[in-house]
């Protein structure tokens, strides 16, 4: 019998990627976050599309158009809050997904890992530009401060900033181009996700043991489709609780004040998911040094496969490395907290210590401990 699922050109691709895909039999719930990220991306594109239908990218009417979405559009408030809190869930899943990759050694699949880093940068750029669009105080000043960092680049910095702004300050030209880029980037992200999956399916998934699972594979459907569905239901529960009970929990009250170039908010800070990088940026007194540290804090992920000294791929049976991994996690929590605090004693000192620890853990301590573990295991 001619099976359409296995022979139709389009269905065949879907079948080989989501139905008959051979998957390791022992992957845990930490492997759910890839599908959850896909769900978050779909949510963001759909809600974003409906928001764009009612949004105006002009500085004189933009704040009113966002208020109009809340007040006058049918279910506009829930669409807007789903989009705003959906971004938070996106980054939560993203950080856990990266953490799982670090813990279980998935970074040894370098193709998939590198596309993942490009995806991370693209998602961060999209989220930053999206935060500017409501044109509240924090939107305006966040855009001013972050784009201004590019002026630290020698020779071309000032010209580059003015080119991005489309003038001599953040204004109408900046808003319209940010809206255009914010609209197009999620589709570029979706294309990159397909490349990410393409590279992943070339090698197959890693598993908690970090060993080859060629001898023990099971079909993706129904086992992992059901498992992913449970994760999806829990994510929906979490998002809906956030949206319906405390939608402004992760936002900034300053963003309910229309953008005013003549009045600076007391504490300019980005959304919570950028605070760790913002804390690293602020911990260096030099502007160019801060920008380099900011970029390095993300780009450091690219050299992790090179720094992998352990003979075992996963951290599952490496207790010393586990201690350092959870120290790194705690350090990121500290950096996130510091990023939201004012620039004063003792927060400056704590931020500097946490920043040094962040780089020291990844560049020095983790490779050293891996070598010690190799010795202990007589490898």
Curated annotation (Swiss-Prot):
Q: Which residues bind a ubiquinone?
A: 201
Ligand binding (heme b b562): 83, 182
Its GO CC terms are: mitochondrial inner membrane; respiratory chain complex III
Note describing how the cofactor binds = Binds 2 heme b groups non-covalently.
> Does this entry carry the keyword Plastid?
no
Membrane-traversing stretches: 33-53, 77-98, 113-133, 178-198, 226-246, 288-308, 320-340, 347-367
Task: Offer one Pfam family short name for this entry.
Answer: Cytochrome_B
**Membrane protein topology class:** Multi-pass membrane protein
Output the PANTHER family linked to this UniProt entry: CYTOCHROME B (PTHR19271:SF16)
Q: Where in the cell is it found?
A: Mitochondrion inner membrane
Matching Gene3D superfamilies = Cytochrome Bc1 Complex, Chain C
Quaternary structure note: The cytochrome bc1 complex contains 11 subunits: 3 respiratory subunits (MT-CYB, CYC1 and UQCRFS1), 2 core proteins (UQCRC1 and UQCRC2) and 6 low-molecular weight proteins (UQCRH/QCR6, UQCRB/QCR7, UQCRQ/QCR8, UQCR10/QCR9, UQCR11/QCR10 and a cleavage product of UQCRFS1). This cytochrome bc1 complex then forms a dimer.
Name this protein carries in UniProt: Cytochrome b
What cofactor does this one take?
heme b
Q: What is its main location?
A: mitochondrion
Protein's job: Component of the ubiquinol-cytochrome c reductase complex (complex III or cytochrome b-c1 complex) that is part of the mitochondrial respiratory chain. The b-c1 complex mediates electron transfer from ubiquinol to cytochrome c. Contributes to the generation of a proton gradient across the mitochondrial membrane that is then used for ATP synthesis.
Sorted keywords for this record are: Electron transport, Heme, Iron, Membrane, Metal-binding, Mitochondrion, Mitochondrion inner membrane, Respiratory chain, Transmembrane, Transmembrane helix, Transport, Ubiquinone
- Keyword set includes Nuclease: no
Another remark in the UniProt entry says: Heme 1 (or BL or b562) is low-potential and absorbs at about 562 nm, and heme 2 (or BH or b566) is high-potential and absorbs at about 566 nm.
**Gene this chain is encoded by:** MT-CYB
